Amino acid sequence: MTVVPEGRKLLRLEVRNAQTPIERKPPWIKTRAKMGPEYTELKGLVRREGLHTVCEEAGCPNIFECWEDREATFLIGGEQCTRRCDFCQIDTGKPADLDRDEPRRVAESVQAMGLRYSTVTGVARDDLPDGGAWLYAETVRYIKRLNPNTGVELLIPDFNGNPEQLEEVFESRPEVLAHNVETVPRIFKRIRPAFRYDRSLAVITAARNFGLVTKSNLILGMGETIDEVRTALRDLHDAGCDIITITQYLRPSPRHHPVERWVHPDEFVELSAYAEGLGFAGVLAGPLVRSSYRAGKLYAQAARVRFADQPPVS
């Protein structure tokens, strides 16, 4: 029996994935470690206070830029997800009991770090009666209570499309409500078997109808075609998505989906122009862009478009 480091048995899909060696990255997949004064101060603070961010723990290549802008991302709900997506490094399994003190700790971390903008994401919690809706909403509420001048972006699962659970989350009023579609319809079930493409679009539409600024992400290099990406961009815009990020898939381990191709930077430039032409209020596309990359600046850009005649929702 083959097991993963977390101790569970490998899925057949993971065994098949592992037969393909980790791909060699092209020369354009690289970053420069530019450590400015804000980054250096924040890193020291995180060390002293024992704070935890997705930025560090996931080894995000954009940490230097985001921390220099006093932006950071936090993961809530535990280390085990009840769903498995073939690109995601978070492990699948039975999550620990709900930690009802987590919203306070995240809010205090945001406060201690002096963040201008915070992104909160989390695992799917299908084991909980409310799917984790209270946890997501309460984290936003607590951050806003302690940090009234800090923007909050909330990246959520689909809560199985449950209207009551979605409404509870929406009512916490994050500056941005994000739900990532990630890939195109043809390969969606293979990549995200516990999600549905149409349901993900419906979540974005519901958030937009509630009056929130909406956001999604597409990952390239998992077997899609450029024409399919263009179609997905049209679907997202038609669904009411305000902000879109587009990125290159980087394989976390041999048991994850192989990289089908490395998308050249020129293609990201073309897709960015295409998305802007569709009317997205904020667009970022590139090999090392991540869904939370420059999130505060993207929100400000989108808010100027969405709320041209009124102040942004806060």
From Swiss-Prot:
<dbReference type="Pfam" id="PF16881">
    <property type="entry name" value="LIAS_N"/>
</dbReference>
<feature type="binding site">
    <location>
        <position position="81"/>
    </location>
    <ligand>
        <name>[4Fe-4S] cluster 2</name>
    </ligand>
</feature>
<feature type="binding site">
    <location>
        <position position="60"/>
    </location>
    <ligand>
        <name>[4Fe-4S] cluster 1</name>
    </ligand>
</feature>
<dbReference type="GO" id="GO:0016992">
    <property type="term" value="F:lipoate synthase activity"/>
</dbReference>
<keyword id="KW-0949">S-adenosyl-L-methionine</keyword>
<feature type="domain" description="Radical SAM core">
    <location>
        <begin position="67"/>
        <end position="281"/>
    </location>
</feature>
<feature type="binding site">
    <location>
        <position position="292"/>
    </location>
    <ligand>
        <name>[4Fe-4S] cluster 1</name>
    </ligand>
</feature>
<keyword id="KW-0808">Transferase</keyword>
<dbReference type="InterPro" id="IPR003698">
    <property type="entry name" value="Lipoyl_synth"/>
</dbReference>
<keyword id="KW-0963">Cytoplasm</keyword>
<keyword id="KW-0411">Iron-sulfur</keyword>
<protein>
    <recommendedName>
        <fullName>Lipoyl synthase</fullName>
        <ecNumber>2.8.1.8</ecNumber>
    </recommendedName>
</protein>
<feature type="binding site">
    <location>
        <position position="85"/>
    </location>
    <ligand>
        <name>[4Fe-4S] cluster 2</name>
    </ligand>
</feature>
<keyword id="KW-0408">Iron</keyword>
<keyword id="KW-0004">4Fe-4S</keyword>
<dbReference type="GO" id="GO:0005737">
    <property type="term" value="C:cytoplasm"/>
</dbReference>
<dbReference type="GO" id="GO:0051539">
    <property type="term" value="F:4 iron, 4 sulfur cluster binding"/>
</dbReference>
<dbReference type="InterPro" id="IPR013785">
    <property type="entry name" value="Aldolase_TIM"/>
</dbReference>
<dbReference type="InterPro" id="IPR031691">
    <property type="entry name" value="LIAS_N"/>
</dbReference>
<dbReference type="GO" id="GO:0046872">
    <property type="term" value="F:metal ion binding"/>
</dbReference>
<feature type="binding site">
    <location>
        <position position="66"/>
    </location>
    <ligand>
        <name>[4Fe-4S] cluster 1</name>
    </ligand>
</feature>
<dbReference type="Pfam" id="PF04055">
    <property type="entry name" value="Radical_SAM"/>
</dbReference>
<dbReference type="InterPro" id="IPR006638">
    <property type="entry name" value="Elp3/MiaA/NifB-like_rSAM"/>
</dbReference>
<keyword id="KW-0479">Metal-binding</keyword>
<comment type="similarity">
    <text>Belongs to the radical SAM superfamily. Lipoyl synthase family.</text>
</comment>
<feature type="binding site">
    <location>
        <position position="88"/>
    </location>
    <ligand>
        <name>[4Fe-4S] cluster 2</name>
    </ligand>
</feature>
<feature type="binding site">
    <location>
        <position position="55"/>
    </location>
    <ligand>
        <name>[4Fe-4S] cluster 1</name>
    </ligand>
</feature>
<dbReference type="InterPro" id="IPR007197">
    <property type="entry name" value="rSAM"/>
</dbReference>
<comment type="pathway">
    <text>Protein modification; protein lipoylation via endogenous pathway; protein N(6)-(lipoyl)lysine from octanoyl-[acyl-carrier-protein]: step 2/2.</text>
</comment>
